[in-house]
Each structure stands twice: as C-alpha cells, then as structure tokens.
C-alpha cells in the first residue's frame, strides 16, 4: 500500500494512536493508517493531479486548432526564426506542424519547455516592464501536449545532434538523438483526443481551415521580414518572402496579381506608408479588412 504523508496527516495519525491507546510497537504503521483512514470521511478539498491541471489550463490557451498554430508560431518568432513553415490537415484537428530555423533547443531545454511555467523570457517580475517577446508564462507547450500527441524535434548550434521527444497526453513516450539542422519542428496530432467534450465543440474542417489561414495572413503582414510558407495537406496555399514591401506581400498572400501598389508619404512628424489597390480593383470582401 502506498500513501502520501504530510505534516498535518502525521499529527492527526499520532493523535489517533494516542486517543485509541494503540501500542504502535505491535502493529504495522500501514495497518494503523488503514484504521485511521477507515474512520475518516473523504476530504472535500484535494490537490489536482498535474495532468488535470494542464488540461484545465489548455482550455484557456487552446481554444481551437488556430490557437495551437498561434502559440507555436509565436514561439518560432521569439526564437529569432526567419523562415517559418506551417502545414495542417482537416482544419488542424488531426495534424499541425510548425517548423522554423530559429535558435533551437538542447535536450535539457526541451524537457524544461514541456514543464509549466518554465520560460526563457523572464526570471523576475521586473522583467515584465521590458518584455518584448510574444509569450512569457511558459504554459503553451505543456498545455498543448496535455490534450494532444506532440512530437518536438530541435537542435541548437552548440550541439552535434538534435533531440526528438514524443509525448501523448503530457506523458513522455520516447526520446532519441536525431540528425537535423538548427531550429525546431513541432508536430501536434489528434488535438483533444483525450478530452472528447472539447473536440465536439470544434467547427467544420473548412471553418477551422479559414481561422488558420487568416491567422497566418495576419502574421505575414505584421512581420514582413519573415518568410512564411503555409501548406494545407502538403499543398502550398501561399508563401511570403523576406523583406517584401507591403504591396508585394499583399499580392503574394491574396494572389491578387499586382493589384496592390506601395505608397510612402512624409509630412513633418507624420510618415504614413502602406499599400493601396489599383483603381480597377473592386472586389470587396471580409478579408479586405485586417486589424492587428
């Protein structure tokens, strides 16, 4: 029999032995504990298991497949990646991969990354005032891995080999050394496989597809110094190049065939710049308006 003893339980157990005048030298401690527990009611307050805590946290962070993509892309950007490739299928419900050429992680760093509240972004509360990264709480990867089957492959510049770690429901299944370039690839499969109540609230594949595509379009417009490649079922949807102008990037993202033209203007302290569509372009739809 295994049980957890804390100071309060030790005190209560000692009180029970004294009150019932039990000769502890003639009876096993486990037998005393059984008698003690038999007379106790089940406590109403108890500590949740770590996997349950992570699954609850996942409900706040992982609302839908696009939220998984968002967290992983932000991690890539925080890792100083210049090329980010995203691939997904079935609205991201069964397969999402995000691969980058960022600084990568060592084996030890991977294992820290899958622990809650482990982060490279801050070390003390004062760091929040100068924070410039997308994330800092260290909750994304452990939350995602608690409700999906996740494979993390990564290598940094200082290591000769990379590391590949497979997880399912937050549990480590395997670890192996691999040959790969510096950077990180994270594959998320079977999202909410162990939380069926969450999966049934996901929308159709097409709706979830659109959320992912819209998200990467927004990232592409905000970070025009990053090359984004977006694939659906291994088929390229769009690809933006590094250091494109806003007009060039809009044309690439929406496949508008040179419909957008760049402009710059300066008047004192005001220097607007952007892109406008050519006069003969009259197609108006929801995706024409992006707020970031």
Where are these regions (language model features)?
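Ala/Thr-enriched low-complexity intrinsically disordered regions
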Residues: 14-15, 30
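Serine residues within intrinsically disordered or low-complexity segments
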Residues: 24-25
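Compositionally biased, intrinsically disordered low-complexity segments enriched in Pro/Arg/Gln/His
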Residues: 8-9
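Compositionally biased, low-complexity segments
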Residues: 20-21
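N-terminal phosphate-binding caps/lids of nucleotide- and nucleic-acid-binding domains
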Residues: 40-292
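Short, Lys/Arg-enriched N-terminal segments with co-localized hydrophobic residues
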Residues: 30-39
